[in-house]
Amino acid sequence: MTQLLAITGTIAAIATAIVPQQGSVGIVRVSGSQAIAIAQTLFHAPGKQVWESHRILYGYIRHPQTRQIVDEALLLLMKAPRSYTREDVVEFHCHGGIMAVQQVLQLCLEGGARLAQPGEFTLRAFLNGRLDLTQAESIADLVGARSPQAAQTALAGLQGKLAHPIRQLRANCLDILAEIEARIDFEEDLPPLDDEKIISDIENIAAEISQLLATKDKGELLRTGLKVAIVGRPNVGKSSLLNAWSQSDRAIVTDLPGTTRDVVESQLVVGGIPVQVLDTAGIRETSDQVEKIGVERSRQAANTADLVLLTIDAATGWTTGDQEIYEQVKHRPLILVMNKIDLVDKKLITSLEYPKNITQIVHTAAAQKQGIDALETAILEIVQTGKVKAADMDLAINQRQAAALTQAKISLEQVQATITQQLPLDFWTIDLRGAIQALGEITGEEVTESVLDRIFSRFCIGK
C-alpha cells in the first residue's frame, strides 16, 4: 500500500464478519469521491425518501443492467467531511450471510470502486486528519480486545489519552529547541542560556517518558494475554483444576494416570487480563509412545508459559517426581498449587514440605471447585509485583510506541551529556531534534510510509 494509493480512487469492502448462515446483517462500506454516484446507480429508494447526509434510506439494491433485485437493504449516507474517512461514505446494510454482501460488493467494484486494502479506511481517516496514529492503533486494539480491561484501555487511546501527553512532551522539546536556536541566531541580542534550567526541563521530560514506558508490559498483557501452564505429575488434579477454573468440562477427568495425552487449552479473563490456560499431560518417564509425545509437549508448554502452576497432590505430599518437575520449571514465574486439600487433615496442611524458595502457594480442592478465587488472587499478585509486569495506568503503549519513546529518551540523555561537556550550541540541537522526531513518530506527525504499511496491515479489509 502507498500513501498515493490510499488517498485516490473510491474503495469498497465488506465491513462485517462473514459468518455463513449466522450473521443477521452484513455491511458493505464504500468511501471516496464516487461513493454516492455508485450508490445512486445501485440503490432504489421507493417513495419520497430524500438522499441527505446522515440519514438512513430503505430500499432495494438492483443490478444496474438487468434491474434484478439483489437484496432488500438499508443505505446510510455520510457526506464529507462528517464521516469516518472524511470522504463521502455510503454503507449498504444488507441481509447477513455470504451471498448478499458478496454480490453487493461485486456490483460496487463493477461500478468503479476498487477493493480496499487492509486498514485502508482507517489509513484514509489518519491521512485526512480525523485520527492520529495512536488513535488508529487503538482502533485495531479495540477490535482485537479479549477482555473488558483491554477494550477500556483501547478506548482510552482512541480518546487521545496517549496522544495528548506525547504532544505535550514534543511541544516542550520544541520550546527548548527554540530557546537554543534563538541564541545561535541572535547571540548578541539575548541573555545567556540557563544551562541548569534546560537540564532540569530535559530531566522532567525524560521522567514522563519513563512513566509511559512503564505501561509497555501492561499493553503486551492486554493485547496478547497471559499464558499459564498447569504442570505436574499424572493424576494430581490438573484437569480438574482446569475444569473448575473454566467452569466447564474442557478436560477429561479419570482416576487413571496419563489420561491427558495432549495440551488442552481454555481462554479465561482474570482481573481484566486475558489468560490462556494450558492443561498439560502429567510429566513422568513412560514407555508409551503417545504419552511420551504428550509429556514432551508439556515441557514445551511450561518453557514458553508466562506463568507455571506447579500442581501437586496434597494427600501424597512433595515427592521426588515433584522435585524433578520443579527443577525443570523453577526458572519460570511459578505458583505452587497444593491440590486435593479436602483429602488431608487441616492440621497437616501447613506442615507439608516443599522448596522454601517457592513464595506463592495456593491450596485448592479442584474437584470441589474450592480455591479458585485464591488462585486468581495469587496470579494478579505476581502480575503486580513485576514478575509478570503490568502497570496500573489507564493507558498502555505498544512495541512501536515503546521503541520511539526509548529513542526519544536516549536522545535527551545525549543532549544532557552534550550540555555537561560544554559543546557548542549546534551540537545541543542535533540530539534534541532526534527526540522531537521520535515523539512525532508516535502520533504520526513524522512517520515513514513503511511504518504506515506495517501498522495498517494489522487491520481487516473493511476497517
Curated annotation (Swiss-Prot):
Domain TrmE-type G stretches: 225-384
GO aspect biological process, one term: tRNA wobble uridine modification
Cofactor: record remark: Binds 1 potassium ion per subunit.
GO molecular function terms listed in the Swiss-Prot or TrEMBL record: GTP binding; GTPase activity; metal ion binding
GO CC annotations, alphabetized: cytosol
Cofactor(s) this protein requires: K(+)
Pfam families attached to this UniProt entry: MMR_HSR1 (PF01926), MnmE_helical (PF12631), TrmE_N (PF10396)
Subcellular location: Cytoplasm
PANTHER family recorded: TRNA MODIFICATION GTPASE GTPBP3, TRNA MODIFICATION GTPASE GTPBP3, MITOCHONDRIAL
Free-text function comment from the UniProt entry: Exhibits a very high intrinsic GTPase hydrolysis rate. Involved in the addition of a carboxymethylaminomethyl (cmnm) group at the wobble position (U34) of certain tRNAs, forming tRNA-cmnm(5)s(2)U34.
This protein's name: tRNA modification GTPase MnmE
